[in-house]
Amino acid sequence: MSNKLIHESDRADWRASIVTIALVIANVLVFVVQSLKGDIADSNYMIACGADYWPLTLSGEYWRLFTSMFMHFSLQHLASNMISLIAMGMIVEHALGHGKYLLTYLVSGLTAGLVSCFYHRVVQAAVVSAGASGAIFGLTGAIAALAIFDRAGQYGIDKRRVPMAVLFSVLVGIESSVDTAAHIGGLAAGFLISFLILKISTSGRTEN
């Protein structure tokens, strides 16, 4: 009986993380397909596939902000991002639910790409950006916001998880070619979105 309960609990945990699992699968599939069709370390190839490159993105190819979120330059790049996505994504998805979690992830990633574009345009740097790290930093911001402002414990974020989120963020950002502007943009977006979600839900509960 106890083993059955454990297995059922494990299945429930995975079902509660279905969006995180889907995002990981999507990133891995994109990586495999692009690796088979060309050289993912080649910036020109990655631009052709949809990487974020500000001269093109800010000229109207805004779809690159989305496609670049699922592209990676190496297996190490993919692996470090997916480990962090699983670790932090499960926390945020359990707290916010599938819809709000996906909204937080996507808006953080899009914001990260946009901030990266404007920053590199200002400094006139021809940087090709790709990867899930901007969105993942958004999850770090979300965890921080919920840990700080959810005083009633409505979303069940354990404040002891914040250092772990910071640690995974550091692991994501240790690569020499890290896009700091994107990470800052994603972090700020995730923090703000979760803060707004918390405030709206708290306000609605108070009015009722």
Regions found by a protein language model. Give the residues of each.
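A detector for small-residue-rich transmembrane helices and their helix-helix packing motifs
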Residues: 2-208
